[in-house]
């Protein structure tokens, strides 16, 4: 899709304005890392703290449309996985994969998204956390926020924030990537061993 097509839908393909807005912010203790890493919250100089936020984005609209077509609330469960893995994959790019703490935010239009849908999103978090635990990725759900923002949101927004401590010696710092290094990329489509169905 062309840049103009994105812009006509209210989406910035480059986010130049956002980059300009944050240009004077601290880059953290590893400025070249994929995510911002800051001083360790516990004050240990051998550790740092990773915090990352992302969400399911426009997949919320797809889940809502599928629910409206089928009447099946289970479509909302997948938003938890979409929101969570947008964070786990980014933190994994920094080498941060252990003992993650999760907080989430669900913003909804209560005229369209009822408590049953919210319950399914939360159930989805419980399910994906259990599946990831079976793969050695331990995440503790620490609660979150559910906001009724019908004046801002047409259906719902599902966002997650992950926090973890990491040993500085184990951080993957993208600033250290050099010519000749091998970068392995994994396709995001298909079906992982912990998934119930094909994932696009």
Regions found by a protein language model. Give the residues of each.
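Helix-biased detector of long, well-ordered alpha-helical tracts
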Residues: 1-200
């Amino acid at each position: 899709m062309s840049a103009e097509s994105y812009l006509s839908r209210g989406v910035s393909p480059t986010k130049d304005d956002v980059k300009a807005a944050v240009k004077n912010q601290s880059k953290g203790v590893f400025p070249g890392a994929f995510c911002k890493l800051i001083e360790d919250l516990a004050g240990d100089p051998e550790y740092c703290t990773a915090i990352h936020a992302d969400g399911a984005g426009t997949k919320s609209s797809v889940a809502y449309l599928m629910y409206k077509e089928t009447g099946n609330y289970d479509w909302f469960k997948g938003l938890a996985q979409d929101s969570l893995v947008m964070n786990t994959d980014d933190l994994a790019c920094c080498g941060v994969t252990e003992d993650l703490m999760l907080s989430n935010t669900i913003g909804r239009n209560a005229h369209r998204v009822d408590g049953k849908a919210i319950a399914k999103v939360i159930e989805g978090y419980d399910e994906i956390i259990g599946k990831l635990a079976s793969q050695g990725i331990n995440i503790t759900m620490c609660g979150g926020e559910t906001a009724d923002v019908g004046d801002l949101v047409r259906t719902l927004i599902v966002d997650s924030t992950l926090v973890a401590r990491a040993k500085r010696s184990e951080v993957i710092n993208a600033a250290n990537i050099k010519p000749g290094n091998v970068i392995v990329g994994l396709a995001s489509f298909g079906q992982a061993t912990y998934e119930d169905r094909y994932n696009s």
